[in-house]
UniProtKB/Swiss-Prot annotation:
PROSITE patterns: SAM_MT_TRMB (PS51625)
Pathway(s) per entry: tRNA modification; N(7)-methylguanine-tRNA biosynthesis
Gene3D superfamilies: Vaccinia Virus protein VP39
Protein name per the record: tRNA (guanine-N(7)-)-methyltransferase
Record has Lyase as a keyword: no
Amino acid sequence: MSQHPDINSSIDANHLTDDQTSLDANAVIDKEAMPDDSKHIRIVNTFMKRRTHMNKNAELALTAPEFAHYLVNNSFGDGNLDGIDDLRALFADLPNGSDAPLTLEIGFGLGDSFIEMAAAEPSRNFVGVEVHEPGIGKCAYMAGTQNLSNIKIINGDAIQLLKQLPENHIDRIQLYFPDPWQKKRHYKRRFVSAERMAIVTRSLKQGGWFHTATDWEHYAFWMVEVLDGFAGLSNQAGAGNFTDRPDFRPMTKFERRGLERGHGVWDLIYLKD
């Protein structure tokens, strides 16, 4: 594990854009207790939908009936989350049932590591939420070709989904390599913020954990600052520390290539008290 110094002095200015200077009073996230009625917080999107190529396998998985059981809602366009208010119920008729440990991955990208984790823990149920159709399709295709029965995929905004779920519902929430929103004027879009973590922790079970990883140094320090100051979460590496990559989080090709070039990757695991 590693420890960071004060966030305002820890980041080499050479790694920042003109807009991405060290955090100042206007950029630091408010750490005051959030109101109980967090369901009514105005949401600023943490993602930007991009047009990307969809290969034939991904398109097949989004349209062919043999993959339909992986897709919880409409996988084209803006995902309609109406009625999705219990992730455990999605597995009621599957081998693991609804009482198995439950992991929610937010923004699984193309799904490679998500599928690898689900295959490695067949007794755990995995739900992935994503907004990009090519990634949703590829993930469903890989799940189908491996005949996995512990995966469900949702198209839509993760924050909106979390607001609809019961309290103390999920055992593990993971957020790997989220968009760092590098420009200072976009910091409000960063997923890890006091407002959004109030929604995330509400859905976590007591004793459950939030695991995040980033390869963007400034965002890493931002996250540890926010999360260490958030009541109800405990840094499993100790306050101010990052943890080594746990064995259960697969290393992606992109991550391995970055490490070979000397880029850093920072993991954080927080337990809900």
